[in-house]
Amino acid sequence: MKKLLAVLVAAGVAASAAFANVEMTLNLYGTPFTSFVMDEEFDPEIRPQGAFGFEDQFGFFFGSPAKFVDIGMTLSYGLDFFRDAEFYANGEKMEDNSTGFGMNTYLTLGPAARFNIGDMHSFLVSPGLGVNLLALSDDIDVIGFTCDFNLDLGYRIWIVNKTGFHFGFDVGYDLSVPLAGSADVDNDYTYDVKSGSRNKIYFGIAFNFGDKSPDKFRAE
């Protein structure tokens, strides 16, 4: 753990040389509701249950010093796992549930607006585009790939505030909606992805490197 933190600090310091302000978060997350609907006559749908995983997010903000609103971009990636999934047809739940192994991984990139309030609080709004891969292995094997629209709403409280370095906690909600994609079933059938959503709630720790310091914020 100490080595991981040392690598993160070194990476943040290096990135700060290129950007005015850099943030990194390490989060755990759960997905209380995920839906994956394939474009077929009976609208086959997969709903993974109890998925839990981890994610990293990097935020790069431009301009100096820090202001009430900072504009930048975010890059996020994550991985989660689940053991159970429900299957639906025409909106009706099928009797058999999957108890095999499933996973979901994603990568998202998009613009971001960060709202700084006082010394300790900041809010993040970040729409973006991403790619998502869902895989399920059971009596039926499914691999689904989608391009998604993503909206991330986050809150961070900074409990350590030093000039050029800040540490705090991170919590938020993230919504992903597929725009296009396909699903392969048992290596025999390929369907277009019709609709769906992934709702994610996350929490973790946050690091900030650069000029988001209380003294510079007040000076602005």
What residue ranges belong to the model's regions?
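Positively charged n-region of N-terminal signal peptides that target proteins for export
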Residues: 1-4
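Hydrophobic h-region of N-terminal signal peptides that target proteins for export
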Residues: 11-18
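Short glycine/proline- and aromatic-enriched beta-strand/turn motifs that initiate or cap beta-hairpins
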Residues: 19-70, 84-87, 181-185, 200-220
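Primarily recognizes Gram-negative and organellar outer-membrane beta-barrels
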Residues: 28, 81, 86-99, 176-196
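Outer-membrane beta-barrel pore domains and translocons
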Residues: 29-35, 74-82, 128-134, 170-178, ...
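Gram-negative (and chloroplast) outer-membrane scaffold detector with strong preference
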Residues: 52-149, 157-163
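Extracytosolic secretory-pathway proteins
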Residues: 146-148, 166-176, 191-197
